[in-house]
């Protein structure tokens, strides 16, 4: 695989990337995403952790980008990475797929503001890292996982039901479970992850427990003109729902039979409706 550098001189982060003295490899599409996600932390007292030091080029890039107030921490498997401590970085050696490593690390460094996973890119490494990061990132912080295109590589054990990308999709499902209409108890991650952003080869999680609350419908109590809602006018499914609701409070055998029959009919109608639009899924990829 050939790696090509594309320099966009309008990107401050790219200019920094090109100016640092030590090697770093980043895909050219990452810079605009990083600037959009991370600009708010520039010149702030933030703790930034990067998994995967390599030749430390990115550590120098982050220091210059975030500014002198930032605390930059690097994690790597290679003990030789400790040499970068003399440049003012905090370096920890360990396996990102190890539960005990993360437990011990966060006991030592405390909560962080930004964690960037540029480590080994396996499903296990990305998922274990995300699990512990989500619990230990401050409200208002970010978890960013790079190079998730490996989730589509056979040599990385994919495609897999348990890929990191599918893990991220499940978190999205959990976020949507906060909707009042679903009336579900949402999972652990949904109480910490406010939103998930997908970029090419990158996934970003916005961590903020303050915003992770169950949503409820509201009204501005403005004047109503009694406008008819045409969304469901004439829809067979809507008529069936209304008919089913008439039996909602009844626990009789006949009511249960009617509700079960309506559910079966609704499932059939839903499958028939799917045929009309599933062709558009072909354009997704």
Annotate each predicted stretch with a short phrase.
Residues 1-114, 120-144, 149-285:
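A short alpha-helical cap/connector motif
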């Amino acid at each position: 695989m050939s790696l090509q550098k594309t320099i966009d001189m309008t990107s401050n982060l790219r200019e920094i990337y090109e100016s640092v003295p030590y090697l770093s490899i980043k895909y050219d599409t990452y810079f605009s995403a990083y600037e959009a996600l991370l600009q708010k932390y520039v010149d702030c007292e933030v703790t930034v952790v990067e998994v995967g030091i390599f030749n430390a080029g990115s550590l120098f890039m982050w220091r210059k980008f975030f500014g002198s107030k930032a605390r930059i921490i690097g994690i790597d498997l290679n003990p030789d990475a400790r040499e970068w401590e003399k440049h003012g970085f905090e370096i920890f050696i360990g396996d990102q797929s190890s539960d005990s490593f993360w437990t011990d690390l966060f006991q030592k460094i405390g909560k962080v503001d930004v964690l960037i996973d540029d480590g080994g890119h396996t499903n296990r490494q990305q998922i274990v890292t995300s699990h512990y990061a989500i619990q230990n990132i401050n409200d208002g912080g970010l978890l960013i996982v790079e190079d998730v295109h490996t989730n589509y590589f056979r040599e990385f054990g994919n495609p897999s039901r348990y890929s990191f990308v599918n893990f991220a999709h499940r978190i999205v499902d959990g976020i949507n479970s906060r909707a009042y209409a679903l009336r579900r108890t949402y999972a652990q991650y949904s109480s910490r992850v406010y939103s998930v952003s997908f970029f090419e080869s990158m996934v970003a999680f916005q961590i903020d427990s303050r915003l992770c609350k169950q949503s409820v419908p509201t009204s501005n109590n403005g004047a109503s003109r009694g406008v008819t809602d045409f969304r469901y006018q004439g829809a067979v499914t809507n008529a069936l729902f209304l008919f089913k609701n008439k039996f909602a409070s009844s626990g009789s055998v006949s009511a249960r039979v009617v509700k079960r029959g309506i559910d079966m009919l609704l499932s059939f109608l839903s499958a028939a409706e799917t045929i009309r639009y599933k062709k558009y899924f072909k354009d997704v990829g």
